[in-house]
Curated annotation (Swiss-Prot):
Domain Tify: 33-68
Pfam family, one: tify
Annotated spans, Disordered: 126-147
Designated name of the protein: Protein TIFY 8
Length: 157
């Protein structure tokens, strides 16, 4: 077994200020106390949090949870993903779904006016339909070769 390496002084930046790790390790507050309690040190997001007088059972339980979480992560990463669609096919499905949503919105945004103004498709790249002499209840709206009467579109409002 190789001899233990020399302890180097390491300064950590924590929200409370800079702390020297070697002085923390040798201070009476951080020394392991024989008995049923120990100190728990957690390194999270670049900071170090210490808890004194933590029962050993809770520390063991926390270690088991950490091991369980890491093994679960590893198993999910190595799982066979052939049954899941690839990201490229998801992108294509999203595009198709987006197209159908746009078509649906275009159809739903057709406006039949009860006044004498001409009905039009509310969209930037559309041209308003021609006004006819028929009453608004029977007027047809033409969009992309399809025609619908105002009564047929009443379910959209």
């Amino acid at each position: 077994m190789p001899p233990p390496a020399a302890v180097a002084s390491l300064t950590l930046q924590v929200p409370g200020g800079a702390h020297d790790v070697t002085s923390l390790a040798t201070s009476p507050r951080t020394m392991a106390v024989p008995g049923t309690t120990e100190q728990l040190t957690i390194f999270y997001s670049g900071s170090m949090v210490k808890f004194d007088n933590v029962p050993r059972e809770k520390i063991r339980y926390a270690c088991r949870l950490r091991r369980l979480y890491s093994s679960l992560q590893r198993s999910l990463q190595t799982q066979d993903t052939s049954m899941f669609p690839s990201s490229s096919s998801l992108h294509i499905q999203t595009k198709r779904r987006g197209y159908s949503v746009i078509r649906l919105l275009r159809e739903m945004l057709m406006v039949c006016s009860s006044t004498r103004t001409k009905p039009m498709l509310v969209h930037s790249d559309s041209i308003g339909a021609q006004r006819t002499g028929t009453p608004p209840s029977r007027r047809r709206i033409h969009a992309r070769g399809k025609s619908r009467s105002c009564q047929e579109m009443s379910h959209c409002w």
